[in-house]
Every structure is written in structure tokens, then in C-alpha cells.
Amino acid sequence: MRVAARFADAALRRVLEVIDRRRSISQLNGLLVAGLVDSVLSANRLADADDGVAVLRKVRLQAVDSPDGFAAAEVFGSYSRGRRMHAIACRIESINSGRWQVVALHIG
């Protein structure tokens, strides 16, 4: 699960950087399923630059059994933006050849 934890941390950091317009949205291709990229775009439009940049603070991972036999994990954590703390969560699943992909995402 260490590989999954490293992937989750890197993916959530990249999502927050895209929302803050520090990275291009194209850098999420392959990390997230297609529909989630659109939701990150909408969060990108709502982000207020006056609040400061998002900084991922804590990430935890819980392995789960998937009914179709693929490895999966629920990921939850927190990030700060300015003086406020926010929640972030996602589900990652192992896809072909041992790669991971974010299949669900919630940004609080």
C-alpha cells in the first residue's frame, strides 16, 4: 500500500496545484478519470487567489476490498488555504499494469 499512499499524496497535491492555477489541467490526464477532470476545472474557477495557495497537510489511506477484484483505497486528508483548514477525500483504484487512478474526488 506504500505505492498507493505515494500516488494518493502526489495526486492530491497535483489537484490542489491545478485548482490554484500553479499547474496545467492537462497534468491531471491519466491520474483522474475523465469526469473528475471537469469537476476540478469548476473548482479552479471558484478558487479565490486572495485566500492564498492550498497546502496539503495530512493524508491517510484505508485499503478496501473492491467487489470486482481490483485493489482500491479510500483516501482522506486535510489542506490549508490561508488560515483555514479544509477536507479532501478520494477513492483510488489499481488499474492495469499496477498503475493507480483517482475514481472519486471530494474537495471541501
Per-segment meaning from a language model:
Residues 48-85:
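Surface-exposed, charged secondary-structure patches
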Residues 86-108:
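Short beta-strand edge/turn micro-motifs at domain boundaries
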